Curated annotation (Swiss-Prot):
It comes from the Bacteria. One of its GO terms (molecular function) is DNA binding. This is Recombination protein RecR. It comes from Albidiferax ferrireducens (strain ATCC BAA-621 / DSM 15236 / T118). The gene is recR. CDD domains: TOPRIM_recR.
Length: 196
């Protein structure tokens, strides 16, 4: 009975991943246990190490193992531009285009009043402080084109519009209702270059 319980616990843990239901979680669990025990152990160790060592960058809030991430420390980055994204996955998608060379602020979420997520929950005060540090001249709003992403961009825009900063939004080449991490790199690059 203990083995069955352990299997159920594994399946439930895998179901926490986005887009993974009972069938997919079961398939993954059976595969790892039946055909890839070394892979299962490597996955377990990698998850443990990441959970123990990854933290949020003190400047931009992305994931890092240091106090300040490599992007924030890179002197080649254009510190006058600050791109606001919802998640580290969105930041990664923008980075992979090679079209952006400024800095980031990762909200680690989006406003969602129905879910009880407000401005304090996504660190808007920290964003406003960072944007008004005297170095930033342009804030690029790269939140997703969902209802929550649009609301988040609007609140940020309202909070910053009187502070003498140039506010831009990714161009609408990114399909409405999409999430950046799932959009092809060419579309993201054009949207970033054609922002308004």
């Amino acid at each position: 009975m203990a083995d069955l319980n352990s299997l159920d616990v594994l399946i439930q843990a895998l179901r926490r991943l986005p887009g993974v239901g009972v069938k997919s979680a079961s398939r993954m669990a059976f595969h790892l246990l039946q055909h890839d025990r070394p892979g299962a152990l490597a996955l377990s160790r990698a998850l443990q190490v990441a959970a123990d060592q990854m933290r949020h960058c003190e400047r931009c809030h992305t994931f890092t193992q240091a106090d300040i991430c490599a992007t924030c420390l890179d002197p080649r980055r254009d510190a006058s531009k600050l791109c606001v994204v919802e998640t580290p996955a969105d930041q990664s998608a923008l980075e992979r285009t090679g079209a952006y060379h400024g800095l980031y602020f990762v909200l680690m979420g989006k406003l969602s009043p129905l879910d009880g997520i407000g401005p304090k929950d996504i660190g808007l005060k920290g964003l406003f402080d960072r944007a008004c540090d005297g170095t930033v001249q342009e804030v690029i709003l790269a939140t997703n084109f969902t209802a929550e992403g649009e609301a988040t961009a609007h609140v940020i825009s309202e909070g910053l519009k009187s502070r003498g900063l140039r506010l831009t939004r990714l161009a609408r080449g990114v399909p409405v209702g999409s999430e950046l991490e799932y959009v092809d790199l060419g579309t993201i690059a054009h949207a970033l270059l054609d922002r308004r």
